Amino acid sequence: MAVGKNKRLSKGKKGLKKRTVDPFSRKDEYSVKAPSTFQIRDVGKTLVNRTTGLKNANDSLKGRIFEVSLADLQNDEDHAFRKVKLRVDEVQGKNCLTNFHGLDFTSDKLRSLVRKWQSLIEANVTVKTTDDYLLRLFAIAFTKRRPNQIKKTTYAGSSQIRAIRKKMTEIIQREAASCTLSQLTTKLIPEVIGREIEKSTQGIYPLQNVHIRKVKLLKSPKFDLGALLNLHGESTTDDQGHKVEREFKETVLESV
């Protein structure tokens, strides 16, 4: 018999259920808000552990990245193949204020674009916006048949591909470097840059399915709360005056 053990002591009964605590009882629900550049502002809900001791719930929420379909943000099924990344930058009450963090295509859409008998042309550009966001934009384009073309294939020559890629790079650089991140987002939603590339390269070789397939955020500037609140249509101070309901009339005293 080992030293320190007493056989007469009754052991605890095995198989007794431990008291289970519902983990969701310790969590709070927060609303995720998209910037005002999108039509639908309410992205959804997210859960986080309540503030206990030194662990602050707001710190756990900041930096969270949500991937949302652009179709849900714009209420338009035509954008279903594009995914937008939103990053939580600030927490106001029970609302998580997000900012644009990137854009991507769904893999099934990319695979459906690649076909036989055509050339695929890709380009990527690293550009800085006017509000100091460093982004990398990836463009994709495909050649198409010329009007009245009999030949089955639409392969572009290597010199034509180089010329098209150069033109793509110039247009992306010009369009992205001359605007803020929110203005660039408004250009990406209706695919303004893709249409501009398609129009300007008609003289080199006709293109189709020209898209900015991916936007990657490389570096963000120092966090500015005022800029984020303006992006969400809010403000830290009420600078706007209130409209007066009726015309003000000065009262004239008859006697002093």
From Swiss-Prot:
GO function term, MF aspect, one: structural constituent of ribosome
A GO biological-process term: translation
Annotated keywords: Acetylation, Cytoplasm, Ribonucleoprotein, Ribosomal protein
Residues with PTM N-acetylalanine: 2
Subcellular locations according to the entry: Cytoplasm
UniProt xrefs under PANTHER family: 40S RIBOSOMAL PROTEIN S3A
Family indicated by similarity: Belongs to the eukaryotic ribosomal protein eS1 family.
Protein name: Small ribosomal subunit protein eS1
The organism of origin for this protein: Talaromyces marneffei (strain ATCC 18224 / CBS 334.59 / QM 7333)
Phylogenetic lineage: Eukaryota, Fungi, Dikarya, Ascomycota, Pezizomycotina
The gene coding this protein: rps1
